[in-house]
């Protein structure tokens, strides 16, 4: 329509001016319209460029900006084309005729609005994403100082723990050193104490001999003590042997298990007889040889006996008492270490519960004297002491020596021998809780073999 109108007006002008051959000069209105049209085009281009610049500044790396191009629609009109990012086109036709300036400005404003709307739609999604990213960055910025502070606290705590660990390690090393020193001091003290006790025992024995051991006993002793003397040859009455010496005298010469019938134990019991050591006739009441039997037991087991007579065993306190109260007995102790070294200890007098009306209530006290042998004396210290087990404490120590040294014995405070201790197979780190005979191998060596056996003192000895 605009073009038709333009053509019509041009035709009219030509009809009116046909008689005139002289060309007319452009009017002021026409110049003004041309200037305004140029300004409008420049304004549109400037606005579009500014928006595109802002779009590139705030959303780098997004879709390419709209492309604005201009051109002539006809000889008397201009065409502005905007190509959007989605390949759609926006065309604006600009009419330079002065009579329609209002419409031209309206179209210009509409074009500007269209351009702005297109740019807004183009930037909407990236800006939304940018806002979310900015919000996330703000949140992270707020949390970062807290995380750094917590990391610093954890690092401080870690350093403190490392320092504490180092202090504990130093303390533990010091305690271990102190423990070793105390063990050494205890071992030395135990040795000094053993020598002191042995010396005192020797002095007391000498004093007793000086005062005369053959003096009559007081009335109480005579009432309590059974008659004990040397054994005559052969069995006392009948054919029942009272111990292994009677078995030997009856003609049996082989080691083995035999039945004996002590004077105060007429029901009798079986024992192992050693028929070879120093003439034979020995009744065995204790043997350790391989660790197959547990010797860390309570009172009832040690009273009644346990184990195998042909292997490791303990005959029982009540049976040892029955044997040693019917005559005067001597004790022989055989020992062997794990290097096949051997030694022995002999005691000319031995008895269990000799002066007791109720030996179990009295704790089966030990009587032993007159040492000789190659192993050294480790038993005289225990003479006069009651038997102690882990569940019946009769020693002179503040602690239960049986529980502490893992055995059962006539402990005093605590021991110089512990033949019923743990079978530890030679040298051991623990202190005095093995099969010990301290005068021969010390307190930290557990023997391979021990055997305790008794025999009556005969007239010809």
Curated annotation (Swiss-Prot):
CDD domains, alphabetized: FReD (cd00087)
InterPro entries cross-referenced by the UniProt entry: Fibrinogen-like_C (IPR036056), Fibrinogen_a/b/g_C_1 (IPR014716), Fibrinogen_a/b/g_C_dom (IPR002181), Fibrinogen_C-term_domain (IPR050373), Fibrinogen_CS (IPR020837)
Record's bilayer topology term: Single-pass type II membrane protein
Alphabetized UniProt keyword annotations: Calcium, Chitin-binding, Disulfide bond, Glycoprotein, Membrane, Metal-binding, Signal-anchor, Transmembrane, Transmembrane helix
Transmembrane stretches, start-end: 34-54
An example Gene Ontology molecular-function term: chitin binding
Cytoplasmic-side segments: 1-33
Protein's recorded name: Fibrinogen C domain-containing protein 1
């Amino acid at each position: 329509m605009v073009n038709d109108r333009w053509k019509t007006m041009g035709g009219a002008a030509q009809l009116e001016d046909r008689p005139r051959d002289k060309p007319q000069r452009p009017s002021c209105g026409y110049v003004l319209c041309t200037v305004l049209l140029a300004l409008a085009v420049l304004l549109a281009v400037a606005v579009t460029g500014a928006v595109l610049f802002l779009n590139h500044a705030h959303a780098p790396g997004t879709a390419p900006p709209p492309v604005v191009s201009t051109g002539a629609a006809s000889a008397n009109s201009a065409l502005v084309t905007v190509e959007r990012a989605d390949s759609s086109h926006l065309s604006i036709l600009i009419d330079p005729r002065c009579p329609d300036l209002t419409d031209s400005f309206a179209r210009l404003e509409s074009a500007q609005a269209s351009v702005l709307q297109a740019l807004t739609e183009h930037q909407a999604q990236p800006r939304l994403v940018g806002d979310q990213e900015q919000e996330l960055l703000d949140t992270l910025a707020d949390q970062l100082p807290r995380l750094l502070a917590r990391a610093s606290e954890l690092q401080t705590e870690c350093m403190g723990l490392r320092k504490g660990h180092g202090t504990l390690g130093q303390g533990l090393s010091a305690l271990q050193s102190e423990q070793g020193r105390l063990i050494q001091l205890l071992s030395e003290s135990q040795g000094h104490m053993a020598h002191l006790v042995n010396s005192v025992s020797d002095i007391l024995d000498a004093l007793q001999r000086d005062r005369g051991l053959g003096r009559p006993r007081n009335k109480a002793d005579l009432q309590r003590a059974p008659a004990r003397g040397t054994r005559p040859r052969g069995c006392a009455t009948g054919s029942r042997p009272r111990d292994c010496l009677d078995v030997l005298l009856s003609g049996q010469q082989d080691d083995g298990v035999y039945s004996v019938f002590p004077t105060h134990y007429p029901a009798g019991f079986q024992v192992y007889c050693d028929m070879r050591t120093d003439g034979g006739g020995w009744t065995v009441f204790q043997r350790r040889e391989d660790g197959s039997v547990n010797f860390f037991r309570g009172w009832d087991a040690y009273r009644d006996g346990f184990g195998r007579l042909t292997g490791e065993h303990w005959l029982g306190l009540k049976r040892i008492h029955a044997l040693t109260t019917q005559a005067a007995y001597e004790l022989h102790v055989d020992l062997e270490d794990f290097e096949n070294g051997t030694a022995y200890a002999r005691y000319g007098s031995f008895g269990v519960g000799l002066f007791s009306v109720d030996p179990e209530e009295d704790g089966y006290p030990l009587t032993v004297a007159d040492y000789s042998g190659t192993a050294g004396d480790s038993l005289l210290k225990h003479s006069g002491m009651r038997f102690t087990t882990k569940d019946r404490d009769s020693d002179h120590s503040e602690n239960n020596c049986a529980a502490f040294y893992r055995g059962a014995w006539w402990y005093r405070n605590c021991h110089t021998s512990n033949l019923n201790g743990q079978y530890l197979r030679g040298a051991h780190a623990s202190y005095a809780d093995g099969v010990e005979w301290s005068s021969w191998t010390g307190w930290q060596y557990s023997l391979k073999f021990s055997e305790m056996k008794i025999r009556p003192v005969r007239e010809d000895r």
